[in-house]
Amino acid sequence: MTDCLEKRIDRITILTGAGVSAESGLNTFRDSGGLWEGYDPLDIATVGALDSNRDMVLDFYNSRRSQLKDCLPNLSHLAISNFQNNFSGHVFLITQNVDDLHERAGSPQVLHMHGSLRSMRCD
């Protein structure tokens, strides 16, 4: 399979979303009991939210960081990491997730479309 892929494909892009990390036990945004339940996204996830609802925003994201500490990468994260490492330089991973489970699984490069819980910047 390696020879076949290397001869035919120069680059592969993988896009992941909430379903990948849900298998590790992370809550998603829209499911029943999801992260938005009880919150208006405009009160939590906008640039102005930090100014107008600082404590609520920090509590929301700190709670998510706390939940993430107890989660481990699952078989999907590991398979993607293995694929990336076997085809080094040919597989580009983009995730809509803000967790670091791809990195913990060993993925060498991950582009986080919506930022990362691992880094926080308040301007």
Task: Report each predicted region and the residues it spans.
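Conserved catalytic core of sirtuin-type NAD+-dependent deacylases
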Residues: 1-123
